[in-house]
């Protein structure tokens, strides 16, 4: 997605389409870049079709058969493209799935590696309010001289928000 707001606006559409993904994770560009520096591997594209990627959704689908999963993938791809995704990348091998989730799992360590002082806040907000809440948090962080890095479970509104600073003292 070009921006986080567009990515997050997609999430409720999965429920409206009666899809039930196993997981829907959101990731901002900066946290993906930090992860890549930390693990030493590029997993997610930085640019597609000449457009810089600003945010990502990592969607996990499950079904009773390969045909059912393939149909869900097609339905999900159509849904996200209609909602403004730049493109759809399918992790169609176990290696690609492992790489995607390994990158996602490294986010906290990547933040810690690059940040002198950080504090974590886990919150749960309604799925349709995630973008609004993160806009508020980012604006407040900026006003306080903090860099905010966030990622989380967009499917259930469980957000991991990190207030980061390399300039402030702990006191």
Feature locations, PLM:
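Noncatalytic alpha-helical scaffold of FAD-dependent oxidoreductases
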Residues: 1-171
